[in-house]
């Protein structure tokens, strides 16, 4: 069993509402700000105090949140993880000087790793939750995502395939501020262990997504994106 209490992440739901999920491996650093695209609804009276950026680690309402979880391992072949997260946010709280609301964000997360052999494994994870802001929960969304990854190692080579699905569902009645989005993607990766310290790799991904707020910014609702990246990694 694991658990903790925390503060300093009240605006986290902002990203899900106005950007949606994103497929990348970049971690936001402490005190970093993340700018939004020119969201049309930020020009309305209802959202006039919302900044065009989010500060994910800001404390707004002074409340403590918590998470609790359970880990279960079986015969060194199977690992199961379950977590429940609640930031205990007050959705009516607002810091006008920074333009950040406290979002009420809650979710459950389930993860499973299974080793078919010493060289082949499967990893799957699912997350489902809700997030809302405003005194009357003017922005009120639910979100869901899952991925499945299969990885196989052959001598110094490792090949992996991953499928992702994600969605944000808009439950509020603010027609001027659409938040719904959905997407799926597939990623293929090859890694080569050149030495104990050096690793080479290539990764290709394809993503198709749709977001209702894109049209207000004169962008197509549906987008398809592809990316190929090369990787050189040194560990010490």
PLM regions with names:
Residues 77-236:
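Outer-membrane beta-barrel pore domains
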Residues 1-77, 83:
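Aromatic- and glycine-enriched pocket-lining scaffold segments that form the walls
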